[in-house]
């Protein structure tokens, strides 16, 4: 029984009916309120503009939502997840379209037939982290060499159990 492999990759996004542009001249507060009203936000100029918007979104939600109990923390995380996934980055010719954006090799490898599309900012952050782990490798104490995990592959970040297993062997 041979089934076609399905590649685990972020699904390209579609801009909402109302999409606003966010650059260094944009008002952060107005942008956050537009996002709460359902607008998508396309990051322009610099990658750091997206980082700034997500940081300010965290601050805004921290001031507006209680974050003490488990239920409140879940509500906070759900709201942050919903709003942060309305922040979009344009991918053109397999590159993030803003200045000073990281070069992410996974974009070309995972989307060979789709050179131009949109991804949410958190998806791009995830692809960037995964690319760095793949490119630089991850040291696992019980192995002689680094591992280079592909996007979407689980690898342990705590190694206590692996060290115990190695000692047992």
Give the positions of each predicted feature.
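Short, aliphatic-rich beta-strand segments
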Residues: 145-151
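Conserved alpha-helix/loop element of class I SAM-dependent methyltransferases that forms part
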Residues: 134-137, 144, 155-169
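N-terminal auxiliary segments of SAM/dcSAM-dependent transferases
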Residues: 1-143
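Generic local-structure boundary detector
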Residues: 52-53, 95-99, 151, 158-160, ...
């Amino acid at each position: 029984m041979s089934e076609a492999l399905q590649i685990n990759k972020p699904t390209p996004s579609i801009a909402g009916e109302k999409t606003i542009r966010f650059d260094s001249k944009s008002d952060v507060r107005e942008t956050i309120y537009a996002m709460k009203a359902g607008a998508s936000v396309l990051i322009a100029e610099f990658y750091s503009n997206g980082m700034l918007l997500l940081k300010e979104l965290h601050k805004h939600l921290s001031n507006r939502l209680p974050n003490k109990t488990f239920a409140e923390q879940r509500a906070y995380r759900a709201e942050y997840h919903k709003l942060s996934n309305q922040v979009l980055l344009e991918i053109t010719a397999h590159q993030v379209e803003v200045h000073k954006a990281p070069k992410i090799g996974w974009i070309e490898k995972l989307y060979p037939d789709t050179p131009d599309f949109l991804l949410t900012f958190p998806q791009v952050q995830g692809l960037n982290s995964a690319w760095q782990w793949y490119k630089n490798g991850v040291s696992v104490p019980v192995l002689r060499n680094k591992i280079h995990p592909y996007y979407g592959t689980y690898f342990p970040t705590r190694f206590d159990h692996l060290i115990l297993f190695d000692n047992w062997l």
